[in-house]
Regions:
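Iron-sulfur-associated redox domains of electron-transfer enzymes in respiratory
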Residues: 1, 146-370
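Gly-rich Lys/Arg/Thr-decorated short loops/hinges at beta-loop-alpha junctions or inter-strand turns
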Residues: 39-47, 70-75, 115-116, 134, ...
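Charged, low-complexity surface patches
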Residues: 53, 82, 98, 128, ...
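Immediate flanking context of iron-sulfur cluster ligation sites
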Residues: 43-47, 127-129, 266-274
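Local cysteine-cluster metal-coordination motifs and their immediate loop/turn environment
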Residues: 50-66, 84-95, 106-111, 127-141, ...
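Ferredoxin-type iron-sulfur electron-transfer modules and their immediate structural context
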Residues: 1-92, 96-108, 368
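Conserved Radical SAM active-site core
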Residues: 79-80, 85, 93-95, 104-166, ...
């Protein structure tokens, strides 16, 4: 449903009928700030706490390049109008009495897409936002939310649709109680899924395809090749560095590889990708992907469904014969920083032992931009 202003009056069910259809996709924007829930955290603040001892050395005053720190009533005071938030005073205080804080959502955003509105509440600049979801998971007040398809998915369950769960390899770290693939499969079937498939299988296919691309393109046509599995990274690279867009591999993502493979096996079935990243929802809403991936759930949304269905994972009967063993360790390693590049480089090394492929990796969008 679309977000509305607090002073806008509408029927509670307005728009519900349009959103209840089983093949509803996301209307942009995907990630939204819930304004009335926002705590209006300061964007950046350097402040002297009560731990200040009023020391005679006052190194904080000496290192401040803007002379923003003065001595009043036996303690240091920072003039916020002069302070440039450089943090030098924070580093030299012997009592750790000066703290530097930043709005958590803005600090987590690698695109610099979050600022304040006229009332001090967080606001997203959608010309910069790539829907990575980092602001969403880092807001301590739960004031940022993404749109979901839980309602549409449950409609499919109730109709008896054959819905396959396509699970990203990162599930092991997200669900410690479902660490075995057999238990994961049992839990997903208990909530209504017809069957469960590892997206790591699609990652293996992606590795082979991307390795072929690399051998054909680099260095004859391209100086380097960038991986394409993360839609947030891909969008950031194309937006911030348009001249390098041609260097991003055109290989399909593991999600799409897996969905298309399962659609070929069972054309009437529907596919639900389950993973840690909200950006996959954006990818699934693309016209070229819609026919392959019907639903996308984050791990948080899946946890909510398991909780709502009262599935006690400790009591699940596990048939180890049905455990997921088809994917390789390299495919499951896609979830790690640099995992895709390593898998591709290892595959090339397997085919061409004498070829030296140099790889580089980064953690988070801010590092990727560097």
């Amino acid at each position: 449903l679309p977000t509305r202003r607090m002073d806008e009056h509408n029927s509670v069910v307005s728009g519900l009928e349009d959103a209840s259809i089983a093949d509803k996709y996301y209307d942009p924007p995907l990630v939204n700030v819930i304004k009335f829930a926002c705590n209006r955290c300061p964007e950046k603040l350097v402040k002297v706490s009560d731990l200040c001892q009023g020391c005679l050395a006052h190194p904080c005053m000496e290192v401040c390049p803007k002379k923003a720190i003065t001595w009043e009533s036996g303690r240091s005071i920072i003039d916020q109008d002069k302070c440039i938030k450089c943090g030098r005073c924070v580093g030299v205080c012997p009592y750790n009495a000066i703290v530097k804080t930043e709005r958590p959502c803005a600090a987590a955003c690698g695109m610099g897409a979050i600022h304040s509105d006229e009332l001090g509440r967080a606001e997203i600049d959608y010309s910069k936002c790539v829907s990575c979801g980092q602001c969403l998971v880092n807001c301590p007040f739960g004031a940022i939310a993404d749109k979901g398809q839980i309602y549409q998915l449950i409609q499919g369950f109730n109709r008896g649709d054959r819905i396959y769960a396509l699970v990203a390899p990162a599930f092991i770290n997200q669900f410690p109680g479902l660490a075995s693939t057999g238990k994961l499969k049992a839990a997903l079937k208990a909530v209504g899924f017809y069957d469960v498939v590892e997206v790591a299988i699609g990652a293996d296919l992606c590795t082979v395809d991307e390795a072929h691309d690399f051998l054909e393109e680099v260095p004859e046509k391209l100086s380097f090749m960038a991986t394409s599995c993360c839609p947030a990274w891909s969008m950031m690279a194309k937006t911030a560095f348009p001249d390098l867009a041609k260097n991003i591999s055109m290989t399909m993502t593991p999600m799409v590889f897996t969905a298309r493979m399962m659609k070929q096996k069972d054309p009437e079935a529907r596919m639900c990708f389950i993973g840690p990243c909200a950006a996959k929802k954006l990818e699934a809403s693309r016209r070229t992907v819609r026919s392959d991936v019907d639903f996308v759930l984050t791990f948080e949304e899946l946890a909510g469904i398991i909780e709502a269905k009262d599935v006690d994972t400790s009591l699940l009967e596990v048939d180890e014969a049905e455990a997921l063993h088809a994917a390789s360790a390299a495919g499951r390693g896609f979830a790690q920083s640099g995992g895709v590049a390593k898998a591709v480089a290892d595959k090339i090394k397997e085919w061409h032992p004498d070829m030296d492929v140099k790889i580089a990796s980064a953690q988070g969008l801010a590092e990727c931009k560097k």
